[in-house]
Amino acid sequence: PNPLTLQDVKRIAATCRKHNIRIAPQINLLGHQSWAETTYALLRVYPEFDETPHVDTKNYTGWPNADGLYCKSYCPLHPDVHKIVFALVDELTDAFETNLFHAGMDEVFYIGDDKCPRCNGRDKAELYAGEVTKIQNHLAQQGKRLMIWGDRLIDGKTTGIGAWEASMNNTYRAIDLIPKEVFICDWHYERPEQTAVYFAMKGFDVATCPWRKP
C-alpha cells in the first residue's frame, strides 16, 4: 500500500552509513509465499513456480488442515525460478547499497512434495541445503553475504522444540551441507532455547533473535 521509493531507500541507507549501522534487507525466499487464503506476488505472477499447485489457498480453513497448508513454497528445482528470484535480490541489495541480504527461509513446511515432478522423492535436507547454497553462492560472487532464520536447521523431534521453531520434516540435516559463510539468525517465540550455542559449535556466525520476549 505504501512502498518505499528509491529515494526513501537511499535516505535510509545514507543514515545507516552515517551511524555505522549495517542494513540487511529481507524478502522471503523458498517458504512464506502465501498466508492463509492469500497467495503472494511471486506465485501469483509465476504460478508455475508453486511447489504444491494442487493445494488451493482459497480453501484454507485455519491450522491444522487436511492439506497441511501453512504457507506456500516455490519449487527450488524449477529451471526458471532463480532468474526471477536473483533479480529481486540484486535489485534490493543494490538499492540499499549493502553487502548483506536476509532470505528468511523459515517455517518451510512444503518442500520435496510427493506430487512435484521435480522434487518428488528428493531428500528434503538436500533440497533445502541446495537452495541455501545457490543463494549464498550468487551473493558471494558479488562480495555479499546471506543471512537466514535458523529454525529449519534444528531437529524439532530430538530437541522437543516442535514444528514452528524447528524442523519436523527432516530439513535439519542441511546444517552440515550449507556453506559456513551463511549467517544464522536464531529466532524463537518465547523460550530461551540454547540453539545459538549449537549453531556456533557447528561453525556458523549466529545472532539471537527473540520474538515476543527479548
Tell what function each PLM region has.
Residues P1-M147:
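Feature activates predominantly on carbohydrate-active enzymes
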Residues A95-E97, Y110, D114-P214:
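Catalytic-core regions of glycoside hydrolase
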